Every structure is written in structure tokens, then in C-alpha cells.
């Protein structure tokens, strides 16, 4: 693949992955609205930027790098949280990157981001139920304890399906929608730098 043959692309993606890992650590609790273990972060901002700049492969690589770094340096979930973040991040940046690559304009970016946000919320609903939360029980948490964290916020929750539907699905969609808005605000300003166009333009003027 041409992406892997371009050293500049690889270095840029590695830097974006490192930034993503830092943003994962700078997460925000949302008390009284979400269970304590669900936190807001914008760690996928570098990933969606990479997906727009270099295609879906770039976005996927940033998701992989940031989660590997977080697993090594800051994980307290035995890798389960990183796996969840990787799944949701890829479900967001891959469709968004494909759509933007095909429709390389602002409308394409909006549609791609919306599709990615919906896809991530949908994928997260099932991946959490069948993969992530069962893995959490292997770390010492019982499923009843997990559901209990939801009932502290909304006592009418009875099942994991309900918990995921009422909390995780809208939270995931809104999180990636906010990430998309931030991307729209900064992408055009940094895109030439990411792709090295600004430097080449300066060199051309000097010549």
C-alpha cells in the first residue's frame, strides 16, 4: 500500500497516535449523568483527522497506536478499555474516511462523520454486550455490579440491554458528534501541514 511507503505519512500518523494517547488520559467524568466508569474524551480527534488526511488506513493506525500506548503506560482495565476504544474508534473513522475519500469536500466530511458516529454507536451496542462487558467480568467485576453502576444514575434499569441502549448508545453518538465538530473547526487549517504542502509551497516561493 502506498500509505506505508511514505515515511512522512508514517511519522505524522505516529505523532497523531501519541497525541491521541495523551487525550485518552485527559478524560472527563460526567457525574449524575453517566456511570462512573464511562468518561468523555476526545482521543479520536487525531484519528479522524488522520482518516481525512491519509484515508481510512491512517485513521485505523492512529486508533491502534494510541490504544497500544495507553495499554502500556496508563491502562487500569487490563486492556479491555483499550479494546473497546479501538473498536469504537475504528467504527467511527473507517466509514468516515472512506466517504470523505470518495466525496472530498465539506459535504462529504459532514456525511462521513455522521455515518461514522451512527456506525460507532450501533457497533458499540453489540460489541459491549457480547465482548467488552463479558471481558470486564473476567477482571473481577460481576455483571450485576456493572448494571448496578447504571442504576445509581437511573434506577429503572433492569438489564444490560437497557443500560447500553439508554446510556452508551446516545453517549457514543454525541461523543463522536462533538469530535466531528472539533474536526471541522481545525482540519482545513492543519491539513496542509500534515501533508507537507505548506513547506513545499514555501520552498517554491523561495526558489
Feature roles, as predicted:
Residues 1-207:
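Loop-helix junctions at membrane interfaces
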Amino acid at each position: 500500500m502506498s500509505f506505508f511507503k511514505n515515511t512522512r505519512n508514517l511519522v505524522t500518523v505516529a505523532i497523531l497516535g501519541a497525541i491521541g494517547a495523551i487525550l485518552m488520559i485527559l478524560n472527563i467524568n460526567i457525574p449524575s449523568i453517566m456511570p462512573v466508569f464511562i468518561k468523555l474524551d476526545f482521543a479520536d480527534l487525531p484519528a479522524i483527522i488522520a482518516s481525512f488526511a491519509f484515508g481510512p488506513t491512517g485513521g485505523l493506525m492512529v486508533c491502534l497506536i494510541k490504544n497500544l500506548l495507553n495499554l502500556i503506560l496508563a491502562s487500569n482495565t487490563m486492556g479491555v478499555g483499550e479494546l473497546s476504544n479501538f473498536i469504537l474508534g475504528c467504527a467511527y473513522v473507517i466509514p468516515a474516511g472512506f466517504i470523505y475519500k470518495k466525496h472530498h469536500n465539506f459535504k462529504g466530511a459532514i456525511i462521513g462523520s455522521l455515518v461514522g458516529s451512527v456506525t460507532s454507536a450501533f457497533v458499540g451496542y453489540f460489541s459491549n454486550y457480547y465482548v467488552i462487558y463479558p471481558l470486564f467480568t473476567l477482571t473481577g467485576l460481576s455483571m450485576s455490579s456493572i448494571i448496578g453502576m447504571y442504576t445509581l444514575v437511573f434506577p429503572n434499569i433492569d438489564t444490560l440491554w437497557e443500560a447500553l441502549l439508554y446510556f452508551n448508545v446516545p453517549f457514543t453518538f454525541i461523543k463522536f458528534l462533538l469530535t466531528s465538530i472539533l474536526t471541522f473547526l481545525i482540519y482545513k487549517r492543519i491539513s496542509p501541514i500534515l501533508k507537507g504542502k505548506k513547506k513545499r509551497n514555501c520552498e517554491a516561493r523561495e526558489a
